[in-house]
Amino acid sequence: MRILHTSDWHFGRSLHGQDLGDARALFGRWLIDTVKTQNIQLVLISGDVYDRAIPPVGQINEVMNLLEELSSITHVLLTSGNHDSAARLGMYSHFLRGNIQVCTRVEDIGTAREYLGTGDDPGVLVYPIPYLEPDLVRSVLSPNDQPLERSHQAVMDAAMRRIGDDLKRRRSEGDLRPAVVMAHAFIVGAAPSDSERNIEVGGVPSVSAETFENFGGDPQAPTPGLSYVALGHLHRPQVIPSSQVPIRYSGSPIAYSFSEAPGDKSAVIIDTHPEDEKLMPHAQRVEISGISMPLALSTVDIPSAHPLVVLTGSMDSLLGKAAQVDRESYVSLTVTDDARPQSMVSRLRAAYPHALSIIHAPAHTPLLAAPQCDLATMDIRSTLADFFSQQGGQPVSAEENSVIDQVVSKVKEDLQ
């Protein structure tokens, strides 16, 4: 069976105020085309299809239309993330085709979704875990009357023990199909970017990778165990290192922060019954103990409507580089001149039509001693002039002093 793993669509999110509708449309077309050309039989979406719990109507329609089109050509399994509203997302399952399953209920953790292969392909077992907010689920997942510890580790351990119990039963009955877990969490060893919302609770924001290997510390973990863990939450595509089980973040399909520059995006393709002649050229075979047929993992690049470019330098150097940058790129510029250049923003926007962030950060900022002053006798005009002089790296001009006088006079007038 050939599976595509994606996550963190965040439909409705912008980048420095820039609407990303064209990027969303490009991703949607790419996803449909990839499912068709790569013969994808199951799409896993590991949380955060929306950026907000109550998304705008336009983004609801975009996601629903894309899911409807996907469901006409393949199976889709979707879980909720920390940005989604699990309750609202769960309601959509009543309006979608039978090929789509939306998994948001904590009570359903440990129930495998079974997908059958064709021919001698046995198919796959998928265990979806929606985003687990410790305060909301530590009583539900507790095996007794006492709530679990208030941490992501504790609730994920409990979820994995439920999955382990079901998988042990299946293994004892001779079911050796590959087993995949979907989760939305921050795993130890992963590298975050600036665009993820902090999910720290009780000082323990992360989950150990060993949780997926030993099923939450179960001394009698099922054998064979998991074949793959399809993660969501972090926006950079990455592999969790030193794990016995393949654990991957697909990353978001669209870049939502300049910390993700250059913004290269991808999805993961999992072949649970790989045939050499059908594998992608760079596919990686993964041997899973107890499963006769190795998995094959590969990535497929997602096109970008607007590559991200981050540039730092003097005003002259930045203006000189403009011709080398694709005019469709979204650009972050940091100007390092000691003095703020005249008309800095307007000149840079003329050179870079999609400059979304322009910052003046002098390369040589003098260290200033803490001022000693008498607040009662301090002159507001001279204080403001001193401040702007220090920040701009040069004395204020007569024109700027005139603006300061006007502002101070207006404020005093309004306060009378």
Language-model features: locations:
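Accessory, non-catalytic peripheral segments of nucleic-acid enzymes
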Residues: 37, 272-416
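N-terminal active-site segment of His-dependent metallophosphoesterases
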Residues: 1-72, 406-410, 414-415
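Divalent metal-coordination and catalytic microenvironments
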Residues: 8, 28, 48, 63, ...
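His/Asp/Glu-rich metal-coordinating catalytic cores
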Residues: 55, 64, 77-246
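Glycine-rich phosphate-binding loop signature in dinucleotide/nucleotide-binding domains
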Residues: 35-39, 118-121, 170-176, 274, ...
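A conserved active-site cap/scaffold subdomain adjacent to cofactor or substrate pockets
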Residues: 216-217, 223, 228-302
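Conserved beta-strand elements of the Class I
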Residues: 4, 125-127, 266-268, 309, ...
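Short, surface-exposed connector motifs at secondary-structure boundaries
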Residues: 70-78, 327-330
